[in-house]
A protein has these predicted regions:
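AAA+ ATPase "lid" subdomain C-terminal helix
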Residues: 296-305
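Compact, charge-rich alpha-helical regulatory domains located at protein termini
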Residues: 466-543
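A short, basic N-terminal segment
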Residues: 1-39, 44, 59-66
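C-terminal leucine-rich, beta-strand-based interaction scaffolds used for sensing/assembly
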Residues: 3-8, 289, 308-477
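P-loop NTPase nucleotide-binding core
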Residues: 37-180, 221
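The catalytic "switch" region of P-loop NTPases
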Residues: 159-282, 428-449, 466-473
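Short acidic, S/G/P-rich loop/turn micro-motifs used as interaction or catalytic elements
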Residues: 80-82, 189-194, 381, 398-399
């Protein structure tokens, strides 16, 4: 069965080379990632941050012999399971970074010894072997600390306990191997972290700054806790969203589709070009949203019919996207009221005003122009800005222009997801409406919300109920969730429950052999179920 690959993590380096579609904006971001400046890549879910990091890594590796700039891709996928105690978490992060560096050096054939420590001594020794083993054991212990077991407090090495020692180690490696600089690329740098861990990561991110060391991190808007790290002062910030008004927007988004399927299947889609383009514009520049909606609308890439496209648009943008957004209030309990307010603000205020502007009669000004834009004053209440950034995280709105000046005041201009705009109308032919909408689109037609807009009044009334500093997930509560959230067959859930594995923590505490006690659960399925339970925890945290 033909299908799309939705996540870069599932692609090999060869597939990344094949699937990546270069745009001017993406190229600028890749060059930024390859540069020797500290920076953040910000974008909502599915906008291609990991793809850009991987392409940047690949291009740096291809030119390594010439430029001697070493990229190191670092993933912190198990972070949420690590003990939250500050020093332990810092040791874990430094250990993971060190092993990622060691792996990259081995991959390039630069590390002729068993480990980094042997490299510095110039010879193999029991001492360096023991040190590498102890660091590996530390990582394993900390990643199992969610079990509330006792963590051995025995010192390991200053290299993962003191940031200055760590940096000196990296300096020595650079000198020994004639490396000009190391660029650490942190994928989902804090998507996998609990809020407290995010703040600790960004402290480390800032402390690693050095002429030989450069850090880049991919982050989400809205749910990132920076602590004392000031994103716009301590780093360069770049956005990843694609411009739907770019001349080559449709061409590039079609190219993303074409590269993942065979020519016969692609021809099925492009023969209905207007329908395909309506899905492309509805996605508002988000590749993952595009691929998911095209797959659904085309009945698993077998046909493209107007009725199916309209049905998919309605379900995807009126139901699925809003449901995913609303779940954030359940996940981040402290944010619930602000999440709920954000939905009401968009549905009851912004979309109503947007439809009023788009339905103007011929005797009204700008009657032939359409909009998906609104602006918010830079001095609007902080809770309003937070609410909008959470909407950004979900892809419901996108920051279009920062520092937009009108009548002497400074605003941020946002665009609403075009699929959301279309499905908020009473139109039955949504694909035709989207094509009409995009043809008349004008960034000058906007709805304005001033610093003290009456639209913000309700949020001011509930602000005392919101504690942004505490907006996290309690890991033990999450581990107590029933196994029903796992993506496995119902009969497997039933059999597993019979053996007493009713919650995620029951599975994670068990061995694969324990799971095999359940009827019809063999070794392969047992491992699959264990991995699903682990992934369910991580996926729930990162969204």
């Amino acid at each position: 069965m033909i299908s799309f690959t939705l996540r870069t993590e599932d692609l090999s380096i060869e597939e990344i080379r094949k699937f990546y579609v270069d745009t001017q904006h993406d190229r600028e971001n890749i060059e930024f990632l390859k540069s020797n400046v500290t920076g953040l890549l910000i974008g909502s879910r599915g906008t291609g941050k990991t793809m850009l990091l991987k392409v940047a890594e690949k291009e740096l590796l291809e030119k390594f012999e010439l430029n001697r700039t070493l990229p190191v891709f670092v993933s912190f996928s198990s972070a949420a399971l690590v003990d939250n105690e500050e020093e332990k978490f810092k040791k874990w992060m430094l250990s993971k970074i060190l092993f990622a560096l060691q792996g990259q050096l081995k991959e390039l054939g630069l590390l002729k010894t068993k480990n980094i420590f042997s490299l510095l001594l110039g010879k193999e020794s029991e001492e360096t072997d023991e040190l590498a083993i102890k660091i590996n054991q530390l990582i394993d212990k900390l990643e199992k600390s969610w079990k509330k077991g006792v963590i051995d407090e025995e010192p390991v090495t200053p290299f993962v306990e003191d940031i200055d020692y760590f940096k000196e180690l990296l300096h020595s490696i650079c000198t020994e191997l004639s490396i000009k600089s190391i660029i650490f690329l942190f994928d989902e740098a804090c998507h996998n972290f609990l809020p407290k861990q995010q703040r600790e990561f960004f402290t480390l991110f800032r402390d690693l700054r050095d002429p030989k060391i450069c850090c880049k991190a991919a982050v989400y808007p809205g749910i990132t806790s920076y602590g004392t790290f000031e994103a716009f002062h301590d780093s360069i910030v770049k956005r990843v969203e694609k411009d739907i008004l770019a001349e080559d927007y449709v061409e590039k988004m079609r190219d993303i589709i074409e590269r993942q399927i065979d020519s016969r299947t692609y021809n099925i889609l492009v023969q209905k070009g207007e329908l395909l383009d309506s899905l492309i514009y509805a996605a508002t520049g988000n590749p993952r949203v595009l691929l998911k909606s095209v797959y659904e609308a085309s009945e698993k890439l077998t046909s493209l019919k107007k009725a199916n496209v309209n049905s998919t648009l309605k379900d995807f943008y009126r139901t699925q996207m809003w449901n995913e957004y609303t779940k954030l209030g359940e996940k981040f309990d402290a944010y619930k009221e602000i999440v709920d307010w954000g939905r009401r603000f968009i549905e009851e205020k912004v979309l109503v005003e947007t439809q009023n502007k788009n339905a103007r009669s011929e005797n009204e000004e700008d009657y032939d122009k359409q909009t998906i834009y609104f602006i918010i004053h830079k001095d609007a209440p902080e809770l309003v800005k937070k609410a909008i950034s959470i909407l950004e995280y979900s892809g419901i709105v996108v920051l279009h222009t920062e520092g937009y000046k009108i009548r002497g005041n400074i605003y941020n201009r946002y665009q609403i997801n075009m699929g959301i705009v279309a499905t908020s109308t009473s139109e039955s032919d949504l694909s035709a409406y989207i094509n009409k909408l995009r043809k008349g689109l004008s960034i000058k037609v906007i709805t304005e919300y001033g610093a003290n807009s009456v639209a913000f009044k309700e949020l001011e009334q509930i602000k005392n109920n919101i504690n942004l500093d505490d907006g996290g997930i309690d890991l033990q509560t999450l581990l107590s969730k029933p196994i029903d959230i796992l993506d496995i067959y119902e009969y497997q859930k039933t059999e597993i429950k019979k053996e007493g594995f009713c919650k995620l923590i029951d599975i994670l505490k068990a061995s694969e052999m324990d799971l095999q006690r359940a009827y019809l659960i063999g070794p392969v399925r047992a491992r699959n179920i264990y991995n699903l339970a682990m992934n369910a925890v991580l996926e729930y945290i990162i969204g």
